[in-house]
């Protein structure tokens, strides 16, 4: 790494630390020529995930949008932000592991529903009502009956 102070092309790493789920590395460096110290960060660049919308359009995957929809479903529920962030990261890493760069919205929605079902049934119903485009009270009754049947197994 080039020194930003004297432009020496070789610097020494004094300390390295992983942060943000080991996706970012912070390095403390020192220049042997001018003895200046500076910090660099290295971030793992992942491939660009695309989302195939229901209308056929393509959109860049947005982790914040995923988080926002889950936060809406879990609002005022006893679900910690740590668990929500872990869920978002797990879904993201699972999507990253798929061979396709373009993922249909229904695949992402199904992953969210599967995770919410395990985490909080009320949040699951809330998310399902939007994701599955509930039209009337019978749609709610059907999903609640499904939850009751799953719990009785």
Swiss-Prot record:
Highest taxon of source: Bacteria
UniProt remark on cofactor binding: Binds 1 zinc ion.
Zinc finger residue extent: unnamed: 3-34
A Gene Ontology molecular function term of the record: DNA binding
GO biological process: negative regulation of DNA-templated transcription
Cited PROSITE patterns: ATP_CONE
Keyword annotations: ATP-binding, DNA-binding, Metal-binding, Nucleotide-binding, Repressor, Transcription, Transcription regulation, Zinc, Zinc-finger
UniProt keyword annotation of Cytoplasm present: no
UniProt cross-references to Pfam families, sorted A to Z: ATP-cone, Zn_ribbon_NrdR
Swiss-Prot/TrEMBL cofactor(s): Zn(2+)
Residue ranges of every copy of the ATP-cone domain listed in the record: 49-139
Function: Negatively regulates transcription of bacterial ribonucleotide reductase nrd genes and operons by binding to NrdR-boxes.
The family this protein is said to belong to: Belongs to the NrdR family.
Protein name per its UniProtKB record: Transcriptional repressor NrdR
The gene coding this protein: nrdR
């Amino acid at each position: 790494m080039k020194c930003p102070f004297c432009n020496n092309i070789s610097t020494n790493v004094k300390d390295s630390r992983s942060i943000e789920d080991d996706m970012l590395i912070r390095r403390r460096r020192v220049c042997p020529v001018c003895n200046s110290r500076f910090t660099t960060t290295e971030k793992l660049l992942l491939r660009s995930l695309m989302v195939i919308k229901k209308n056929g359009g393509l959109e860049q995957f947005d982790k914040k949008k995923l988080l926002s929809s889950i936060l809406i479903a879990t609002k005022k529920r006893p679900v910690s932000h740590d668990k929500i962030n872990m869920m978002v990261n797990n879904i993201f890493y699972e999507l990253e592991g798929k061979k396709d760069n373009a993922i249909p919205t229904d695949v992402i929605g199904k992953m969210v529903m599967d995770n919410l079902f395990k985490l909080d049934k009320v949040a699951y119903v809330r998310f399902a009502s939007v994701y599955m485009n509930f039209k009337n009270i019978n749609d709610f009754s059907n999903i609640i009956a499904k939850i009751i049947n799953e719990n009785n197994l």
